[in-house]
Every structure is written in structure tokens, then in C-alpha cells.
Amino acid sequence: MKLDLKILDARMRDYMPAYATTGSAGLDLRACLDAPVTLQPGETTLVPTGLAIHLADPGYAALILPRSGLGHKHGIVLGNLVGLIDSDYQGQLMVSTWNRGQTEFVLNPFERLAQLVIVPVVQAQFNIVDDFAQSERGEGGFGSTGRH
């Protein structure tokens, strides 16, 4: 898949989104910062990537997801948990960065911060019904299928 990418900050030419391995599902996104940013515990900030994408095809969307190492080791996750980039969005990719950890975290310029995953999208149309055909599960939720 070819994806239109707009470089908003010339420094990002040296830090293009890339797959870390041939089996990677996510492209690494980096913090486009002029200086380090310190996030205190509980603090959230929007971090620019210096990049914009335009998917154009309504059959696709992009997800901005946290990097597992930052979340597990440092408590750095996304403030909105998942960022959804619609196919018609053309603005800068921003990463809502939340320090849910117990200590301050310093985010350095061009550090890998999140990952971008391209996913297929199906736009649903609704069929209004009075009742559903009976299923084995029915309305059971929130643990109704058991713990183990």
C-alpha cells in the first residue's frame, strides 16, 4: 500500500516512520521536539510528530498505539488510549502522551514514542429490528462466559 506522507518539519526526513522488523505491524512514530519534555506523573501533553498522512481511501484508517516498552517500563501510554486517524484527515499526527507512572519521564527529541498501524475499515449500515435471532450468549456480558 502506498501512503501519502507530508513532512511538516524538515528534520523528520532523517526520522521517517519505519517498521522495526519485517514482521512489525506498526510503523514507529517519533517525537518532533526542539528540546526534551519532562512529563510529571499524571501529566498529559500533545506531542507533534512533524508528519501528516492522507489515507484518502475510506476503506482504511490508521491507529496510533502505544509502544509496549514505554508503557511497561515507564508508564508512558496514550492519553486517549488509541488514536484513530480517519481516511479524510490531513492534519499533523499528534500523540496524546500520558505519564501514568510514579516518576517523571523525560521525552527526548526524535525519540520513538508511538506506532502507527494501518487497518481496513467497514462502514456499517443499520437494519432496524424489534428483536434479534436468539444466540447462545444472548445478553450475557461482563464475565458471563466464565473466568477460565
Swiss-Prot record:
It is an enzyme of class 3 (hydrolase). The keyword Metal-binding applies. GO terms for biological process: dUMP biosynthetic process; dUTP catabolic process. Pathway: Pyrimidine metabolism; dUMP biosynthesis; dUMP from dCTP (dUTP route): step 2/2. SUPFAM superfamilies: dUTPase-like. It catalyses: dUTP + H2O = dUMP + diphosphate + H(+). InterPro entries: dUTPase, dUTPase-like, dUTPase-like_sf, dUTPase_trimeric. Its cofactor is Mg(2+). Pfam families: dUTPase. HAMAP family: dUTPase_bact. Belongs to the dUTPase family. This is Deoxyuridine 5'-triphosphate nucleotidohydrolase. It comes from Burkholderia ambifaria (strain MC40-6).
